[in-house]
From Swiss-Prot:
Quaternary structure and partners: Part of the 30S ribosomal subunit. Contacts protein S5. The interaction surface between S4 and S5 is involved in control of translational fidelity.
Gene Ontology biological-process annotations: ribosomal small subunit biogenesis; translation
UniProt source species: Cuscuta exaltata
SMART domains, per database record: Ribosomal_S4, S4
Subcellular location per the Swiss-Prot or TrEMBL entry: Plastid
Recorded name of the encoding gene: rps4
Cellular-component GO terms for this entry: plastid; small ribosomal subunit
Protein name: Small ribosomal subunit protein uS4c
GO MF: rRNA binding; structural constituent of ribosome
């Protein structure tokens, strides 16, 4: 299944706010609960919607999300927490959380167009897994710097998660540590996502 490129507002009306996908918010409580009219949800549907929230927020294909679940299962610790940490430490998500891009799709475009350096080297893979002490900067070109500056000024972050630091212009992002899952910017029950895939295999 390919990455979603359809109407974004349609997704947030059904699933709720997805800040990684779009800055828009459901306009009313009715929008947020658009599907409640269809009656009580089955357990399968509840798990499916949590999975879809995760997939659309982080901009993943179904295959990518399955691979992350498999990696998380093999690691020591809570599968759900490790899954979220893996997704949060993707380069495209780090750029979004720092405010260097307005959304994760916008961050992916920055990376694909080779505007982003990690530790002084161009990285053009949005799924690149960042690690503590990585330093994120833009390429030393006016256009690259302007894209990041415009995003930070247009979409300022009220509070950065504690695993990230953003230094002022010339903007530089620093990864302090692996994210604590309480700082995740999405309301999600990751255990339901793990359960969804457990029942598919």
């Amino acid at each position: 299944m390919s990455r979603y490129r359809g109407p974004r507002f349609k997704k947030i009306r059904r699933l709720g706010a997805l800040p990684g996908l779009t800055n828009k918010r459901p306009r009313t409580v009715r929008d947020l609960r658009n599907q409640s009219r269809s009656g009580k949800k089955s357990q399968y549907r509840i798990r499916l919607e949590e999975k879809q929230k995760l997939r659309f927020h982080y901009g993943l294909t179904e295959r990518q999300l399955i691979n992350y679940v498999r990696i998380a299962r093999k690691a020591k610790g809570s599968t759900g927490e490790i899954l979220i940490q893996l997704l949060e430490m993707r380069l495209d998500n780090i750029l979004f959380r720092l405010g260097m891009a307005s959304t994760i799709p916008a961050a992916r475009q920055l990376v694909n167009h080779r505007h982003i350096f990690v530790n002084g080297h161009i990285v053009d893979i949005p799924s690149y897994r960042c690690k503590p002490r990585d330093i994120i900067t833009s390429k030393d070109k006016p256009k690259s710097g302007a894209l990041i500056k415009n995003s930070i000024e247009a979409f300022p972050r009220e509070e950065l998660p504690n695993h990230l630091t953003l230094h002022p212009a010339p903007y530089k992002g620093l990864i302090n540590q692996i994210i604590d899952t309480k700082w995740v910017g999405l309301k999600i029950n990751e255990l339901l996502v793990v359960e969804y895939y457990s029942r598919q295999t």
